[in-house]
Amino acid sequence: MKKKIGLLVMAYGTPYKEEDIERYYTHIRRGRKPSPEMLEDLTERYRAIGGISPLATITLEQAKKLEKRLNEVQDEVEYHMYLGLKHIEPFIEDAVKDMHNDGIQDAIALVLAPHYSTFSVKSYVGRAQEEAEKLGNLTIHGIDSWYKEPKFIQYWVDAVKGIYNGMSDAEREKAVLIVSAHSLPEKIIAMGDPYPEQLHETADYIARGAEVANYAVGWQSAGNTPDPWIGPDVQDLTRELNEKHGYTSFVYAPVGFVAEHLEVLYDNDFECKVVTDEIGAKYYRPEMPNASDAFIDCLTDVVLKKKESVL
């Protein structure tokens, strides 16, 4: 009989319906309810992208496809997928409890975020390992980052090339690629967090592969807190690049995210487009990885490499 291995797929989570927004936001704010104004602002953003984010559906599809693919490409072990979310059910701890109840003794933990940071990957894996230790007889093997995975870089190289190939030579000369990820509080830099450096590396790999000379790194979707967040913000960066270099076509690659959701559909497709419209420039944003075969193949390689190194 094949050994069963847990596949713990972790992600941020998103409201399933409008009524979930308040409790979801309260969880993000560590139990503090948002003010009516804050709640209204977030609700309006969801309404602007069609009422609710497609993230929940995409995340589940990514996880199910990954489990299926892992069991197709090898027959040494049997992977059982468990979904654990940071801010809404099924919570990370619930997924770990389910694994334990199913008799799983080893699990590979994959966060659907390519770059490592103490705020994201470390906290997700930490929560899972803490719960596993409480329950006993279950070891969680966490994957720190996978932004260097060749198939991840290739996904974005192909996506960016697809946009540039549709441009005339004249437009290409005046085009710039903005590679971005979710901003985090600036204090992580002083803590030696590798997150900003990893995004810069990712941008270099993609630009080199797609043969794009003009590119910059930006940050987006910063939280509304008194602490300073890492910049430049993508909107400010767009204006600056237009003023300083005269770029008139902007290609946004939000590579820190793996699916279409609020941060991409609103913060990029709406807010960044407002800026490009304002300055008379063209807006482009390649398709996100979502549950595409190319992306699932990438994640399959990531999990298999981790499994080989620990089990």
UniProtKB/Swiss-Prot annotation:
GO terms for molecular function: ferrochelatase activity; metal ion binding. It is an enzyme of class 4 (lyase). The keyword Cytoplasm applies. The keyword Cell cycle does not apply. Keywords: Cytoplasm, Heme biosynthesis, Iron, Lyase, Metal-binding, Porphyrin biosynthesis. Pathway: Porphyrin-containing compound metabolism; protoheme biosynthesis. One of its GO terms (cellular component) is cytoplasm. Fe(2+) binds at residues 182, 263. GO terms for biological process: heme biosynthetic process. Its main location: cytoplasm. Its EC number is 4.99.1.9. Fe-coproporphyrin III binds at residues 12, 29, 45-46, 53, 124. NCBIfam families: hemH, PRK12435.1. Belongs to the ferrochelatase family. Involved in coproporphyrin-dependent heme b biosynthesis. Catalyzes the insertion of ferrous iron into coproporphyrin III to form Fe-coproporphyrin III. This is Coproporphyrin III ferrochelatase 1. It comes from Bacillus cereus (strain ATCC 10987 / NRS 248). The lineage of its organism: Bacteria, Bacillati, Bacillota, Bacilli, Bacillales.
